[in-house]
Amino acid sequence: MLGKAKEAFDLEGNITNEGTINFLEQCLDNFIQYVGVVSKLKRPKPIEPEDLDCNKPIATTVTEVDHDDPEWVEKVAEITGAVSGDTYVKLDHGILTVNQIDMFLKAMPFELTYADDNNQFLYYNNAHQDPDTMLAKHVPSQSGSRMSTVHGSLPPARMKNVEWVIGTLRNGNQEYVRTIVPGSPEGVINTHNYQAVYYDDGSYAGINEIVFNFKPWLDWYLETTGQRPCRRKRSFCTGCN
């Protein structure tokens, strides 16, 4: 095919020979099946029930303040002497002030949250004046709360989903868990990405959640590349009808 590239592709870069297309699709299908078989060789660890009530304090847990105290941030900041404002913080490869870190995180095109390995909800990048404009609604009083409190309005079946996500990442059964929230309004693909955070020794240190509307990213990609979704499975095409 490479020796006859002019005949093999049309002016828009699409393969013209249907037999070649079918052959390549079969190769992709076989590869995907192979990956599926190999993945099953590594059996996932069984998921134990998660303690969403923060009953197992870790080294960084502040026990003097109740986790669900709506003024948890202010009280813990006073107890720990937490720095703020223009105080410099040495990071992994850089030095920023606390204000710069705040600005940097708020400028991210995502809603970010972090809960530690004791299932305590410690942080979200509070970039929205109105929580109702968030894809995953959070309010300042939730910082520090137990995960059972943060998700307290969920029915039991969905709380089991929360436990499954945390347990899956804690066990290393998956590198990440991604989901699209159904029932979103037109123009919104409400995407949630849950990623494990690890200590230097490789042990589980908590979970980082990224929430964003994937639709503008998808639209930008298609417009920039001149592609559009094709009817063929797992495919994007140039000039495809």
Question: How would you name each of these model-derived features?
Answer:
Residues 1-56:
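Glycine-rich phosphate/pyrophosphate-binding loop and the adjoining helix
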Residues 21, 25, 91, 156-159:
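Generic detection of long, well-ordered alpha-helical segments
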Residues 41, 111, 172-175:
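A general structural signal for well-ordered secondary-structure junctions
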Residues 55-87, 94-95, 101-105, 211-241:
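Juxtadomain coupling helices with adjacent low-complexity linkers
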Residues 86-128:
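Sensory modules in modular signal-transduction proteins
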Residues 116-123, 127-223:
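Sensory/regulatory domains in signal-transduction proteins
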